[in-house]
Amino acid sequence: MPTIVLSLGGSILLPDIDRPNIKPYISVLTRISAKNRLFVVVGGGGTARQYISLARSFEADEAFSDELGIMVTRLNATLLVGALGQAAYPCVVTSHTEALCAAETGKIVVMGGITPGQTTDAVAAVLAERTGADIFINLTAVDGIYSADPRKDPAAKRFETMNPAELLDVVIGQQAVAGVNTVMDIVAVKMVERCGIPLLVMDGRDPALLESTLETGRFVGTLVTRNGKNPFPLKK
């Protein structure tokens, strides 16, 4: 059975508390888990950023702000576990080792942040390595990796394929510009480079696209691999 690790942005799952995107994900993740060993790492999204910003206004240190962010990711993850019901392992796991043990139940394993200073993308990248994942999918608010921020630069071009070293160059270049949000952080990219597990960065706002990609192997996004080979269809 193939192993899939998803990094699901908090802003994708909960763009707003009054406009949740959880319900469409329930049936999709449940169907995916019937054919795959599935791990989902949930981010904090805008809510985490708001809490962190407020903490900083009180001159809280960065470690404290990180802990606040982790709490929000786990709150989002807990909400997803509750929504998935019997399809999910009943607790939000708090370590990679616990995730491996929870997977023995055959349920969807959900986690949030675990370490101050580390994004949930990095958590998911390490989890992909620990589980020997067949594919690591980063579900974001953009449809792939671009040469520049497509929301600010109309000339930005999307990469269809690239290797981890090329992705690292793009991320480093974009992070050097103040105020620019990159699709993935440097630590996560370095983990992908180290473990060599294929990474797909794609738009997560419509979960049907995720299911279609896994079923057909066709996708709109950026595939990052060492050898340029398409990992789809995943080996059964």
From Swiss-Prot:
Catalyzes the reversible phosphorylation of UMP to UDP. GO terms for molecular function: ATP binding; UMP kinase activity. UMP binds at residues 44, 66, 114-120. This is Uridylate kinase. GO terms for biological process: 'de novo' CTP biosynthetic process; UDP biosynthetic process. GO terms for cellular component: cytoplasm. InterPro entries: AceGlu_kinase-like_sf (IPR036393), Asp/Glu/Uridylate_kinase (IPR001048), Uridylate_kinase (IPR011817), Uridylate_kinase_arch/spir (IPR011818). Its EC number is 2.7.4.22. ATP binds at residues 10-11, 45, 49, 140, 146, 149. Homohexamer. It is found in: Cytoplasm. It comes from the Archaea. It comes from Methanospirillum hungatei JF-1 (strain ATCC 27890 / DSM 864 / NBRC 100397 / JF-1). Inhibited by UTP. Pfam families: AA_kinase. Keywords: ATP-binding, Cytoplasm, Kinase, Nucleotide-binding, Pyrimidine biosynthesis, Transferase.
